Amino acid sequence: HGGKNGFNNTYGKNQIGTFTLPESVIVCYQLLDTLPEDHYKDGLIELIKHGMIANEKIFNSMITKTSFNVDFEIIREGIDVKLKIVSEDFLEGDKRKLLNFGHTVGHLVEKDSNYEITHGQAVAIGIYYELLISKEQLGLPKEIIDSYLKYLNQIEYEYEYNFLSNSEKLIEMLKHDKK
């Protein structure tokens, strides 16, 4: 329901695309049970990201869970976070950039791994590194990072990544990132 449609090319993720709203969006929670586990976890990362950028209730609910199961109210709140941000900034002028949290580093991870790492896993890694940068540059409390890492450990998601490319190539990839 974000209206952003894109595809990858040799320069990176979502380099070609449009902003076009769908006529409708259907949410069928029962389909979540049919997803492979890694894709389900990718969705969990999207939810925790929404909690970190705009809804503390989602974040607190996610980090206190002891299972993968997420109640529908939290999913609905995650959808509402995205709808609110997109409705306020459809063409990604300013506020919508919040939804890119974790994506700058995440896109580097995806490209560097030749897309062998799922988008959600890459964003999870990206969030981790962007939190570390926020701690270093802005004084983000370590407790937020610890809570996030605890959650990633609970869902058995890796959060560290050893880049295969050298720093010059990574910088070149960053120059082509859509953001």
Predicted regions: what they are:
Residues H1-T64:
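A glycine/threonine-rich phosphate-anchoring loop and its flanking beta-alpha core
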Residues S24, N55-S61, V105-V109, Y128-Y129, ...:
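Short acidic (Asp/Glu) and glycine-rich catalytic loops that position anionic groups and cofactors
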Residues L44-I48, I74-K82, I127, L152, ...:
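Short alpha-helical scaffolding segments that buttress acidic/His motifs in well-ordered protein cores
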Residues I48-N55, T66, K82, D89, ...:
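Structural signal for hydrophobic packing residues in well-ordered secondary-structure cores
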Residues N100, T104-I144:
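Internal helical hairpin/lid segments
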Residues I45-L47, G139-K179:
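C-terminal charged capping/lid subdomain of soluble metabolic enzymes
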Residues T64-E116:
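Oxyanion-binding "anion nests"
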Residues E73, E77, N100, T104, ...:
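Amphipathic alpha-helical interaction segments
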